[in-house]
A protein has these predicted regions:
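Short N-terminal binding/cap micro-motifs at the start of the first secondary-structure element
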Residues: 11-16, 42
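Short, aromatic/basic amphipathic alpha-helical patches
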Residues: 15-25
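Helix N-cap/beta->alpha junction signal
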Residues: 8-10, 138
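Glycine-rich phosphate- or other oxyanion-binding loops that anchor nucleotides, phosphorylated ligands
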Residues: 24-204
Length: 204
């Protein structure tokens, strides 16, 4: 089975690839890397284009940074694994099958545009540990994976307190601090993650 590691930008992919190679996994694991870019439509298009080229089974491991809202309870930069994805526009929630657990399970909210504040929801949502995580891609990674019946893990690294830590104070525009992104990705326990995925693959 092929392992496809996806991320939003080349900077993230390059950092992840570097540390996965450094993990020095001895198993014969075929790993590909795919940059899906930021946003839901880019994610769908790039995943579909990749998947259409292969007939063999694929395990998708998605690693992206995300925003968070509950600043009090959240330990910054500690990765979480999406247990559900929630489309904040349609207010529909989707449960992700637990193929392999590699990090604490949490709810993940997806938007079609960058989130400036905690969204108002008509539907009452109970979040695990009352922690809120936001991005633009998880729901659509989940959508494509389920359509093709592909096992997948969505791993998120909380980087910024929504619209307060990556905002440019001069022009009021959203801006990543790429050094912080690289630092977050560097600290992930890639060896442990890969071992758990290999164990799941070998059990099938």
């Amino acid at each position: 089975m092929k392992l496809l590691v996806t991320a939003a930008t080349p900077a993230e992919i390059n950092a992840i690839k570097k540390w996965i190679k450094a993990a020095n996994i001895k198993k014969n694991l075929d790993i590909d890397y795919l940059c899906c870019w930021i946003g839901n439509y880019e994610t769908i298009l790039n995943l579909e284009n990749y998947i259409s080229k292969y007939s063999e089974p694929i395990f998708i491991r998605n690693i992206w940074i995300c925003g968070y809202w509950n600043h009090e309870n959240q330990k910054k930069n500690i990765p979480i694994q999406a247990a559900t994805t929630f489309n904040i526009h349609t207010e529909k929630e989707f449960v992700i099958p637990p193929f392999a657990q590699i990090a604490p399970m949490r709810n993940c909210f997806s938007s079609e545009k960058p989130i400036k504040e905690k969204p108002y929801l008509k539907k009452e949502i109970e979040c695990i540990n009352d922690e809120w995580y936001f991005d633009m891609e998880s729901r659509w990674t989940e959508f494509v994976s389920l359509k093709h019946k592909l096992p997948h893990i969505i791993l998120k690294v909380p980087l910024d307190f929504v619209w307060q830590e990556t905002i440019d104070l001069y022009d009021n525009k959203w801006k990543f601090i790429w050094k912080d992104v690289a630092d977050c990705l560097e600290k992930l326990p890639y060896h442990d993650y890969l071992q758990k995925i290999i164990e799941w693959i070998e059990s099938q």
